[in-house]
């Protein structure tokens, strides 16, 4: 009787141990990845499918702005995010003290200038309102694009984080309107033109190759990335996540789905 009890207890404890081990293994193989809506979210759905074949489960968390995904990653609410370019990450690390690092390049979204009021930049009238993102890196990116198009000039040392205060020549006296990047597509009726990040443009139904009246050179510093906490860089799931993103399936999806508006960077 006692022997049967001991054997039964041992079996129960063994099963419990196996269950606990399985639970831990499952937890280690499931990660939460933050994205913004539009192409980033669509691409991550394909990454999720590929990763699952290699034992990595991805839970996608979608955000509607640029600030929260890094805050959530730094606080431990996410394991990774995929929505930003490296200059933005570096600015956030410097300004907020986040211990976040870049682990892989993903895609490039050339920024475009859009308008519902003019068909070319040459048609912009003196005093025209131009909307640009209000965060330092994307705002600077927009101003550099406007400079490239000959609409204004910036101080030579303004760099990637240029602000309207760095404008030294503005022949048409353009009025720069700084808005949250995600909200700019909604402002097109209220401004004469707007510099819009491609992910937000596409989410709003705009087609960069067809609708932009000017577009950024894709061979710039604004390659999008996957970011993680520095402390997690040696965890096994990191390599699995990168391999899934850099898979032929994802590359084919990007090329067929976005028709050159989004460009793979690996």
Describe every region a protein language model picked out:
Residues 28-38, 56-62, 129-130:
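Short, well-ordered beta-strand elements
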Residues 38, 62-66, 76, 81-90, ...:
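Beta->alpha turn/N-cap motifs
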Residues 60-71, 158-186:
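Short helix-initiation/N-cap motifs at beta->coil->alpha
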Residues 66-97, 112-114, 119, 139-142, ...:
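Pocket-flanking alpha-helical
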Residues 91-103, 116-118, 190, 195, ...:
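Ligand-binding "clamshell"
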Residues 103-152:
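A conserved helix-loop-strand patch within extracytoplasmic ligand-binding domains
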Residues 105-114, 138-147, 202-266:
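Periplasmic-binding protein-like
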